[in-house]
Amino acid sequence: MFIVCSFFLNLRMAYLLIATLFYSINDFLWSIYSKKSGPLALIQNRSIYTSIFVGLLFVFYSKDLGLVLEGTNSLKLLGVSSIGFMGLYFLVKGFQQGSIVQFCIYILLTTTVVGLISNFNNYITLSSFIPSLLCIGFGFGFFIYHQLKTHLKNSSTYKSHLYFMVAQLFFIVLVLQQYEYLSVFSAVDIAFYQELTVLLFSSLLLFLKKEKTSFVKQPVQWYEYFLIALPISIAQLSNLQGLQLTNPFYEKLFGLLGPVLSVVLAMVLAKERHQFTTYLAFIIMLIGYYFLGL
């Protein structure tokens, strides 16, 4: 019995670890390529490849195609996939004017909200989570104060914070809805439907409204879209499998490793640098999650 439980635990952690690693790579790539292309064009071209990757798995591993295509179920998947598209769009908009560290700060806030919503009944007294919230709140307030103080006249800073905040609000709803639907649909079904929806919406919006691409210095090549699509395809499927075996709280808590890896990648590969106060605020918020039970 102990061996079976240990295997299940290791399998669950393996899925979440793989998802975390590839989400970190994905976030880093978004931060680089979002400055080379318009958001809709970038999302559309990336979703072509992700639809192919996940689509192949869908063809071979989908257990019940009729269940996915049934009217009510199809609308449910369309709804949750639309939320994912909106979150992705605002994420790319945020990266056009913001940085990895800014985005990771909002990931930490997202984890707080998802953790409290999905695991609130486990907190018997206020004292069990108030210290964590105070620490996280102080770190975030400290970060925002120095960001606004340093970039007082820079409107792009305000916009990037707004975009990242809106993106994370959509992602909160997305994770909670996906967790609910995983009791009915497989991870492959949800991932494939989501990528098709992203491709459909981005293509439709591009057709209706042409994007301005005058800021692009060098066009993104097809093989670069392939490189962007592969990490997120692996991350999505691994994350959904891990989410199916755990719950949104553990998925988000384990994902706290992601912001750290993303920041390290940005510092090492992209030479992204920030003031000491920014990194200090990030560390203070991470300490808050230690109090939360990390």
State the predicted function of each range.
Residues 24, 81, 85-86, 111-116, ...:
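Hydrophobic/small/kink-forming positions within alpha-helical transmembrane segments
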Residues 12, 21-29, 36-86, 134-142, ...:
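Transmembrane alpha-helices of multi-pass small-molecule transport proteins
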Residues 49-53, 106-121, 197-201, 235-238, ...:
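Alpha-helical transmembrane segments of compact multi-pass small-molecule transporters, enriched
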Residues 54, 109-116, 125-147, 277-294:
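Hydrophobic transmembrane alpha-helices of multi-pass small-molecule transport proteins
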Residues 35-41, 90-106, 122-124, 183-190, ...:
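Structural motif at transmembrane-helix junctions in multi-pass transporters
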Residues 12-19, 58, 65-90, 157-169, ...:
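Loop-to-transmembrane-helix transition segments
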Residues 62-72, 119-126, 151-152, 176-189, ...:
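Membrane-interface helix termini and inter-helical loops of multi-pass transporters
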Residues 2-41, 132-136, 153-189, 227-230, ...:
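Glycine-/small-residue-enriched transmembrane alpha-helix faces in small-molecule transporters
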